[in-house]
Amino acid sequence: MQRIIGTEVEYGISSPSDPTANPILTSTQAVLAYAAAAGIQRAKRTRWDYEVESPLRDARGFDLSRSAGPPPVVDADEVGAANMILTNGARLYVDHAHPEYSAPECTDPLDAVIWDKAGERVMEAAARHVASVPGAAKLQLYKNNVDGKGASYGSHENYLMSRQTPFSAIITGLTPFLVSRQVVTGSGRVGIGPSGDEPGFQLSQRSDYIEVEVGLETTLKRGIINTRDEPHADADRYRRLHVIIGDANLAETSTYLKLGTTALVLDLIEEGPAHAIDLTDLALARPVHAVHAISRDPSLRATVALADGRELTGLALQRIYLDRVAKLVDSRDPDPRAADIVETWAHVLDQLERDPMDCAELLDWPAKLRLLDGFRQRENLSWSAPRLHLVDLQYSDVRLDKGLYNRLVARGSMKRLVTEHQVLSAVENPPTDTRAYFRGECLRRFGADIAAASWDSVIFDLGGDSLVRIPTLEPLRGSKAHVGALLDSVDSAVELVEQLTAEPR
């Protein structure tokens, strides 16, 4: 497997000592405190390069018009515009009223788990650093998707695809998969409906906020398929599939399967026709209704209607995708990572079919439901009890000593796929097999000489009359194998840029 993938997570934020605190301000404090603790002076903080951003470009071939006026100019010093690129190649910034960690590009789904988990440690450290500032309010950060008051914030996934793949084929092939995968990838939620007012438990935190089948926007009229066409790469060759329907996961198996199975289904969409594998027979009659119906049935027995009249459960749909992906994987050269994803996927589906609680050491929603059921029985509570919402929230607390997920890990009740050493290394270091290596190492070695950066560029300020932009439009270039020796051979940013911009002989 070598598909470029990555995650971006907006974290929930609260200030228990000051409930009226402005979340934009507290999110800004979190990002700036982390920057200060990393020894980055404000004047030398690398800015984000917004020049290549085009969030209103639609994959269906048009640009969504702004309501009025020209594109806004972002002042990097404004409250709410705090932004930094980390030495691991990630982006840490304020998105709306939340601190967001956008992980660096990876090619291996297990690596993506590691660098996504590193984001949790970054956020924990950010809150800790804010607490060390005299007079600053204490912050608590949560890796979740709902605030309990009707708002949802995103945990998005990104997958690089061939531009040659028709977007209509992506919609057809991916929609039933995304609708049904929540039986594996849901993080669990107390409450039904956007505000969570109706008592009960559901699989996904995100499902109640999905309103349309296909759409460009991410904060309203959210679609099962998002159409943002912003590849952050060579637009003639690539598209970036931006997936917004997913939950913020803490369980490593949930994240691994979320990313790994989706990447393999995209292989199926791109390569399936050559292997006589068709997905059109899985079209759903009412996809948005199906998202809600599957999420609201933790017994996993709810069925949804297909366009051809069949009724299938979410598990049955996942089983069909598994079988077709397995057929594709078997037809290719041996790929240990793809084989492991298929094996893990099959194992989890078997356990969910037998008893979802058999997955309580692997997946988020069964783990959370087991905690909640135990608490309900001990305290004789119904699903309408407000204290259950607090347990739900505490599960996602990023503090290692307080978060209920992290406490399950500490006592051996949640299976890990990666080591803490790998996670802590990923906090500081980039993946070695993508352009994130070049970005992160440039920040580490020459941070004072970098004016700005983005996913597809690094901009150097070498003291001359103009800045120097080094494009990184090819995601697999800029790896350690590609530029490691070059970076080791130079002593300054000036030397590096001279080498990169020299005319070939």
Swiss-Prot record:
EC number per UniProt: 3.4.-.-, 3.5.1.119
Disruption phenotype: Disruption of dop abolishes pupylation. Cells lacking this gene also become hypersensitive to reactive nitrogen intermediates (RNI) and are severely attenuated for survival and growth in mice. They also cannot depupylate proteasome substrates.
List of residues binding Mg(2+) 2: E8, H156, H242
Pathway the protein contributes to: Protein degradation; proteasomal Pup-dependent pathway
GO terms of molecular function: ATP binding; hydrolase activity, acting on carbon-nitrogen (but not peptide) bonds, in linear amides; metal ion binding; peptidase activity
Record: residues binding ATP: G6, T7, E8, V9, E10, S102, A103, N158, R240
Active-site residue list: D95
Binding-site list for Mg(2+) 1: E8, Y93, E100
Presence of keyword Metal-binding: yes
Keywords assigned by UniProt, alphabetized: ATP-binding, Hydrolase, Magnesium, Metal-binding, Nucleotide-binding, Virulence
Cofactor(s) listed in the protein's UniProt record: ATP
Enzyme class name: hydrolase
InterPro entries: Pup_deamidase, Pup_ligase/deamidase
Catalytic activity: [prokaryotic ubiquitin-like protein]-C-terminal-L-glutamine + H2O = [prokaryotic ubiquitin-like protein]-C-terminal-L-glutamate + NH4(+)
Biological processes per GO annotation: modification-dependent protein catabolic process; proteasomal protein catabolic process; protein pupylation
Cofactor binding description: ATP is required for the deamidation and depupylation reactions but is not hydrolyzed during the reactions.
Effect the entry attributes to changing R206A: Abolishes pupylation
Pfam families the UniProt entry points to: Pup_ligase
UniProt cross-references to NCBIfam families, sorted A to Z: depupylase_Dop
Subunit structure: Interacts with the prokaryotic ubiquitin-like protein Pup.
Family recorded in the similarity comment: Belongs to the Pup ligase/Pup deamidase family. Pup deamidase subfamily.
Reported function: Specifically catalyzes the deamidation of the C-terminal glutamine of the prokaryotic ubiquitin-like protein Pup to glutamate, thereby rendering Pup competent for conjugation. Also displays depupylase (DPUP) activity, removing conjugated Pup from target proteins; is thus involved in the recycling of Pup and may function similarly to deubiquitinases (DUBs) in eukaryotes to prevent or promote proteasomal degradation of certain proteins.
UniProt protein name: Pup deamidase/depupylase
Species per Swiss-Prot/TrEMBL record: Mycobacterium tuberculosis (strain ATCC 25618 / H37Rv)
Lineage: Bacteria, Bacillati, Actinomycetota, Actinomycetes, Mycobacteriales
